[in-house]
Amino acid sequence: MESLPAAEVLLSGRSDRLDDDLLGRLAEHPLDSIETEYPHHVGAVDGPENPERPSDRHPVFYGCFDWHSAVHSHWALVRQLRLVEDHPDREAIVDSIEARLTETNVDRECERFDEDPTFEKAYGWAWLLHLAAELDRWDDARADAWRATLSPLEDTIVDLVHTEFLTDERPFRVGTHGNTAFALHCVFDYAQSVGDRSLETAAGETATALYADDADYPIGYEPLGWDFLSPALTEADLMRRVYDPDEFAAWLDGFLSGVAEPPVDLPIEPLSIGEDPEDGVALHYVGLNLARAWSLAGVADALEDHPAVPALEATAGRHATAGLEQAFTDDYAGAHWLSSFALYLLTRNEGGIGCR
């Protein structure tokens, strides 16, 4: 890939500031991976006759190694179609999605949740709602048709969010798929985007119940294990959605005490994994750099004239550059998911993310 744009451009969150090379890379791996059936992760096998082929069990979202990655790769492709009118891969993306997104296939996807209502809770649910919201935001006849086809699965997930997620009494403070705050902010964004005020209120109430009293978070202990999310910054990225600016600034000063007054003490720097990591799990740290970048940038935007803003923006820029330098790896351990994280960062101000 050609050299990256300046950090200011990367953090702008605007697709019109991205060059053709970067746009091309953002579509390459998702388009290939959504049709790549193997390797595939199976969480449990019920008997000697199992597992079914991924394309039989999940006829829409069978690629990308696991269900949630297939879902967010579809989100990434749909978002690019919405934002880039003359996308060079438009025809290929449309043909690929339409080949799988049928009423029969969506019904089969819904059956999986009848069999196991906890399947992909809540990370996969969060990305499915992002996909539905993206289709809702796109003023296009094809998007309307796709949303109508997907709607039974969307409705299933919304119901499960109400009954099986927003009722949780303890948050999972992890840096991987189980992170409660990440799923909550996706639910919150979906609800705001599609105008579901009841869900928006419920998500905000759950966030407040779980996180309002948090204080003195030891962010310097991160990362843990093979994190691809920052528990601290993901929580802050959620609460800046829930609170108004003054409330959020007061909460953040208590949550990350090092940012309350200058000189700002934010003891995190981009993670380095080397040029050619042999351990695929190490690629989680590339995602962590990207996720830290979008969280830091979002928090800085919400703080307005807070004294921590310059330090937050500078740290976000370093993480964005480090993450994007390795996000487009051809190693399938990263290729099946990292482009979605890159797109999330690079288009974070194009609607559907942190929207009020």
Task: Show the residue positions of the predicted features.
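Fungal-biased detection of long, low-complexity, Ser/Thr-
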Residues: S272-R356
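Low-complexity, Ser/Thr/Pro/Gly-enriched N-terminal "stalk/linker" regions
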Residues: M1-Y62, D331
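Haloarchaeal acidic low-complexity proteome signature biased toward cell-envelope/secretome components but also
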Residues: M1-D21, I93-R108, I268-L271, P307-A314, ...
